[in-house]
Amino acid sequence: MLFEDNPAIIHESGAIWHRDFLHYPDKHYLDAREIDSLDTFDNERKIGYGGWWFFAFNINAIEYYSFPFFVRGDDLLFGYMHKKHNIVTLNGVASWQMDFERKISVLNSYLNFRTVAVPALISKRKFAALLLSVFFVREVFLASFSCRYELARAMIMSYNDCLSGREFWEDNVDLLEIRKRINAITHNEK
């Protein structure tokens, strides 16, 4: 996946799972115009998941279905549920996407934090909950210091919802009540 605004810069070529719950984009910000970058791009790494717009898979290998509609980060969760599969990337297959920073909204911030939280909450790693809390505090501070208080509020709402237990997730699959709550706090950042 490459950036629409800067078409030679790679956003990611799949993503890597780190310590079972953290993730980061592979080959992030690699410049496809540089010869050395192309050599780096050829080096295959174990990929954990890929974005919907450039990720193909055998439908018979699917064990758990994702939502039948796009929800921010559902490709990450889908990849997490199917991380045992051997994923390969292909040079020459690409798509250009709008920079995620331009897509930030209050609802996206809520959903993004929720998506990041799920692997940490179900991880058996000793410090997963602590690292999730550090990530949460950092994101809320960044939003607050940028005067994006509605984003910060949505992240706090998401954090609390994530800790509400299984019933919350089952009762809110359609996001209907969550959208109402998000709309109620969204006045300036639409």
Where do the model's predicted regions map?
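Catalytic cores of nucleotide-enabled group-transfer and carboxylate-activating enzymes in metabolic
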Residues: 1-2, 42-46, 78-81, 117
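Conserved nucleotide-sugar donor-binding
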Residues: 35-65
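Catalytic donor-sugar/metal-binding loop of nucleotide-sugar-dependent glycosyltransferases
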Residues: 67-71, 76-96
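Terminal low-complexity segments of carbohydrate-biosynthetic enzymes
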Residues: 114-190
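Short, flexible, basic/aromatic active-site loop/helix in glycosyltransferases
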Residues: 15-47
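Alpha-helix capping and helix-loop boundary segments enriched in small/acidic/polar residues
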Residues: 48, 66-74, 103-107
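Conserved donor NDP-sugar-binding/catalytic core segment of glycosyltransferases
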Residues: 1-23
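Nucleotide-sugar-dependent glycosyltransferase catalytic core
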Residues: 90-92, 96-115
